[in-house]
Amino acid sequence: MLNETPALAPDGQPYRLLTLRNNAGMVVTLMDWGATLLSARIPLSDGSVREALLGCASPECYQDQAAFLGASIGRYANRIANSRYTFDGETVTLSPSQGVNQLHGGPEGFDKRRWQIVNQNDRQVLFALSSDAVSYTHLRAHETELH
């Protein structure tokens, strides 16, 4: 299921939320901004359902948190100290995003961009960043794992 929110993402367009379900009863909610996981509700053997993710109260709150909750991390994961590295003997300088360091792709990381929804149904979604030749799929049918 695909829904738009009245709240607008940093690019001025509504956040697009997707809800996926599988045969095991798992329900996952994602948004196209940052290809972000918002919720993963897992059925337990006693019949109850448990939320498996930490998250924010609303899609727009994800812009103001620094913990990368549910985020798609990239172009790289982790910290680049002092926002620079050496490649083929040349120093490459990056924009800092956490103090003097760059973290998880920096100010223009994958979590801060709108991903294209290439293909989507009730059981899976394929997101892509065509400019970076990056794509990934969430939740396949008959599984209780995210891939």
Range-by-range predicted roles:
Residues 24, 131-133, 143:
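Short, well-ordered turn and helix-capping elements at secondary-structure junctions
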Residues 76, 93-120, 130-136:
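Covalent nucleotidyltransferase core used to form phosphodiester bonds in nucleic acids
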